[in-house]
């Protein structure tokens, strides 16, 4: 019970309580599960608390905006594009208190080192991303980030076939590329029963 209370209230802890130590929060789940929306909600709360916030996203994700993170529900927050995790570290100002990172799965494994370093400096690090690729395999560096995070939030979507809680991102077009940026035009949320690994477009809609 104490652990559950800590997870619910961690974002409201004043810096005087946690001293100089930062922490890492990971928001993970399938597409359309509200990851970016939850990230933006936490960032807005930090700004209301007058904390300095910086937000980053991978350069390759320009689906909705070049200089904002945007949820599927149209929530928005200003962000800076980064080509690599090391570039994020270089861009973080010394007085920044909260760092938000969206689409963590698109960064390399160096993101783990960067997140740890920022937390060591006393920064609250919030990372949102897909924990599985379109085949259902763990998507690095998200598993490693989940292992080192103090706080983890697992989000779920609604299966587009049966309406049950969805944990998978079903690709609805033919491609074997692991990274294929898209939205509802290319992917559907699926539950365990309805998810078809390696499915191509004709199979998906049977």
Predicted segment positions?
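Residues at the starts of beta-strands that form the adenosine-phosphate
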Residues: 52, 124, 151
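Structural recognition of the conserved hydrophobic beta-strand(s) that form the central parallel beta-sheet
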Residues: 100, 123-131
């Amino acid at each position: 019970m104490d652990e559950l209370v800590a997870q619910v209230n961690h974002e409201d802890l004043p810096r005087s309580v946690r001293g100089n130590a930062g922490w890492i929060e990971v928001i993970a789940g399938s597409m359309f599960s509200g990851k970016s929306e939850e990230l933006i909600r936490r960032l807005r709360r930090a700004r209301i608390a007058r904390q300095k916030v910086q937000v980053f996203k991978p350069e390759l994700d320009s689906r909705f905006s070049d200089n904002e993170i945007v949820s599927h529900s149209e929530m928005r927050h200003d962000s800076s594009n980064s080509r690599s995790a090391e570039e994020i570290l270089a861009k973080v100002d010394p007085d920044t208190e909260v760092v938000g990172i969206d689409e963590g799965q698109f960064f390399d494994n160096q993101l783990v080192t960067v997140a740890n370093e920022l937390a060591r400096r006393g920064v609250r690090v919030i990372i949102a991303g897909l924990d599985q690729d379109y085949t259902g395999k763990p998507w690095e560096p998200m598993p490693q980030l989940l292992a080192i995070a103090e706080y983890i939030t697992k989000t779920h979507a609604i299966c587009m076939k049966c309406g049950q809680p969805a944990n998978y991102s079903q690709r609805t077009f033919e491609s074997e590329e692991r990274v294929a940026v898209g939205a509802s035009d290319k992917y559907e949320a699926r539950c365990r029963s309805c998810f078809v690994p390696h499915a191509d477009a004709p199979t998906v809609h049977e």
